[in-house]
Amino acid sequence: MVIHGGIDGYSRTVVFLRCSDNNHASTVLSPFTDAVQNHGLPERICSDLGGENVDTWRYMVEQHASTSAVVTGSSTHNEWIERLWRDVFRCVGVLYHDTFRKLEEDNCLDPLNETDMYCLHFVFIPRINSTHLKVLLIHGTTMLCLVRTT
């Protein structure tokens, strides 16, 4: 499972977070364009050099007719998104990581079995998106740890 996210660089507002079962460029573009509909088109975006961002870069260049609409580089230079990832892992990722690890230890989940992985994604991706990540989007990172269940 992969979580993609975006933050408004000015207000530091989380504009999208979505869990999915792949890291394809079209998968990243979908929540980005949803965020554009809700928050407007940004002047520019900053992203790392990952191939999963290619469609989003292309979209921005087409919308602005300029390559200056995309700034790429190391994500370590973007402290706000790094802080978000730390909080997401600390308060959401750890919960599911521990759950999935326990399922493996109890021989209820084989990560090499396609059926097991399909079922895991079918059950957990909607739950992660509709509860944990949705609450974070509504309330921001200050509410994140209130979402955590142990």
Residue ranges and their predicted role:
Residues 1-137, 144-149:
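RNase H-like DDE/DDD metal-dependent nuclease/strand-transfer catalytic core used by mobile genetic elements
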